[in-house]
């Protein structure tokens, strides 16, 4: 599991940062990529990476401001040009209006896609769940309807303890598969063994939270609780003047992000959606200020890739 930042700026593109889009790379977990927001020129950014549009199976849109959605029609069209077909459908989760926006752009430009799109209007709570992941949405406080997302990976089953099976003189073969599935098996010699006795501890799944435009609110902490990574907007810095600007424009400061990361017991905080004025020394100052409140903080740049490892068992690390 990895995060790849395709755009880390706010409002409009700059020389150093494109507008918002983040890829959650789930190639090992489900051979797929999920996009969170698709700002203008996201498809151009993708061309500079190893990402393949056909691998994108889900798109999550936080809100309908242009710097978060203007790249959608172009990306969808290019995905079609690159050969996506009816066996590679795409689901777009977003506020009411995202379907109208996409369909209007495609209709007026007479663009016909070679694959189906399913649209899911966001509601509070679980918006997607299967055997590998669950995604939870909650409303934010911005100038228009806006949402945050919590991606929860399901726990991974423990490994089959082969050495323990051998010590118990349990012969290899199909029985191992049954025990791995947690079944109770009767062996040829009459012994009855329970698969759960030969399976190691489950590996706890990872949690990633996306808060891309909002002023502070209780739902941010709720979505971020115990997250391995919290990706949080930081349109403004921590000065008193910038705090006033953030409040006026319904955004957050870097201090807001650090505070919620600390209260929510987040492992790593990644700041994105930065104003264009944050370049060079100002970025270093921003990092320095935030790390005084939350040490494990990183300021994302376009094309950064961040690994999200499994948490080590506390007993293992002793």
Curated annotation (Swiss-Prot):
Binds 2 Zn(2+) ions. GO terms for molecular function: 3'-tRNA processing endoribonuclease activity; zinc ion binding. Its cofactor is Zn(2+). Zn(2+) 2 binds at residues 67-68, 213, 273. It is an enzyme of class 3 (hydrolase). Zn(2+) 1 binds at residues 63, 65, 142, 213. The active site is at residue 67. Keywords: Endonuclease, Hydrolase, Metal-binding, Nuclease, tRNA processing, Zinc. Its EC number is 3.1.26.11. It catalyses: Endonucleolytic cleavage of RNA, removing extra 3' nucleotides from tRNA precursor, generating 3' termini of tRNAs. A 3'-hydroxy group is left at the tRNA terminus and a 5'-phosphoryl group is left at the trailer molecule. Zinc phosphodiesterase, which displays some tRNA 3'-processing endonuclease activity. Probably involved in tRNA maturation, by removing a 3'-trailer from precursor tRNA. Belongs to the RNase Z family. Homodimer. This is Ribonuclease Z. It comes from Leuconostoc mesenteroides subsp. mesenteroides (strain ATCC 8293 / DSM 20343 / BCRC 11652 / CCM 1803 / JCM 6124 / NCDO 523 / NBRC 100496 / NCIMB 8023 / NCTC 12954 / NRRL B-1118 / 37Y).
């Amino acid at each position: 599991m990895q995060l790849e930042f395709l755009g880390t700026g706010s409002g409009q593109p700059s020389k150093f940062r494109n507008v918002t889009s983040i890829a959650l790379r789930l190639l090992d977990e489900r051979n797929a990529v999920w996009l969170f927001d698709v700002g203008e020129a996201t498809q151009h950014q993708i061309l500079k990476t190893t990402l393949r549009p056909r691998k994108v199976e889900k798109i999550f849109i936080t809100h309908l401001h242009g710097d978060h959605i203007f790249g959608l029609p172009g990306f969808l069209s290019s995905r079609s040009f690159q050969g996506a077909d009816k066996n590679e459908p795409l689901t777009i989760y977003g506020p009411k209006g995202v379907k109208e926006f996409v369909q209007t752009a495609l209709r007026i430009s007479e663009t016909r896609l070679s694959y189906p799109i399913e649209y899911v209007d966001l509601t509070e709570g679980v918006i997607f769940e299967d055997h590998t992941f669950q995604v939870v949405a909650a409303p934010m406080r911005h100038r228009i309807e806006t949402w945050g997302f919590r991606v929860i990976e399901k726990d991974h089953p423990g490994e089959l303890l082969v050495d323990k099976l051998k010590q118990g003189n349990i012969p290899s073969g199909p029985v191992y598969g049954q025990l791995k599935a947690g079944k109770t098996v009767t062996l040829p010699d009459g012994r009855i063994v329970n698969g759960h006795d030969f399976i190691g501890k489950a590996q706890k799944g990872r949690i990633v939270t996306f808060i891309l435009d909002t002023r502070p609110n209780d739902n941010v902490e709720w979505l971020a609780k115990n997250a391995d990574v919290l990706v949080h907007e930081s349109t403004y810095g921590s000065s008193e003047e910038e705090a006033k600007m953030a409040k006026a424009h319904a955004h957050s400061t870097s201090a807001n992000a650090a505070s919620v990361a600390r209260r929510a017991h987040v492992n790593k905080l990644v700041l994105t959606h930065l104003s264009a004025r944050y370049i060079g020394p100002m970025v270093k100052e921003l990092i320095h200020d935030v790390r005084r409140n939350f040490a494990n903080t990183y300021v994302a740049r376009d094309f950064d890739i961040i690994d999200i490892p499994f948490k080590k068992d506390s007993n293992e690390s002793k």
